[in-house]
Amino acid sequence: MKSAFKSEFPFEKRKAESERIVQKFHNRIPVICERGGKSDIPDIDKRKYLVPGDLTVGQFVYVIRKRIKLPAEKAIFIFVNDTLPPTAALMSSIYQQHKDKDGFLYVSYSSENTFGDDALFSEE
């Protein structure tokens, strides 16, 4: 899925912004979070996040759930490079493995595991 953020801002501008963020906030990770293509979950009101490196994926999912006011009975999945990251993984680890060339970590969320069961077993 093509990121709307990438479409809106040229690479040079995104790279300069992520470098400025990382330099200013050493222990924070610049994350872009956008709704996945065919999801019935509402759009998020804010897509740019500065996430503490020691936050787990599960804690980040909780933050996203709160931002979109998702009821507890509704499932949500987040994807990084079309894979479902382990819930206990630290965001700093996911960032090191999957950050984009522009310096941002791109995360999408969906109400379905749209990439099949194989995505549940992504390697760290």
From Swiss-Prot:
> Posttranslational modification, per the record?
The C-terminal 8 residues are removed to expose Gly-116 at the C-terminus. The C-terminal Gly is then amidated with phosphatidylethanolamine by an activating system similar to that for ubiquitin.
SUPFAM superfamilies attached to this UniProt entry: Ubiquitin-like
Residues marked Cleavage (site) = G116, D117
Q: Which gene encodes it?
A: ATG8
> What membrane topology does the UniProt entry give?
Lipid-anchor
Q: Does the keyword Plastid apply?
A: no
Function recorded in the entry = Ubiquitin-like modifier involved in autophagosome formation. With ATG4, mediates the delivery of the autophagosomes to the vacuole via the microtubule cytoskeleton. Required for selective autophagic degradation of the nucleus (nucleophagy) as well as for mitophagy which contributes to regulate mitochondrial quantity and quality by eliminating the mitochondria to a basal level to fulfill cellular energy requirements and preventing excess ROS production. Participates also in membrane fusion events that take place in the early secretory pathway.
An example GO CC term for this entry is:
cytoplasmic vesicle
Q: Which family does it belong to?
A: Belongs to the ATG8 family.
Propeptide at: 117-124
Q: Where is the lipid attached (Phosphatidylethanolamine amidated glycine)?
A: G116
Any GO BP annotation? autophagy
Q: What name goes with this protein? A: Autophagy-related protein 8
Per the UniProt record, the lineage of the source organism begins with:
Eukaryota, Fungi, Dikarya, Ascomycota, Saccharomycotina
Keywords, A to Z, come to: Autophagy, Cytoplasmic vesicle, Lipoprotein, Membrane, Protein transport, Transport, Ubl conjugation pathway, Vacuole
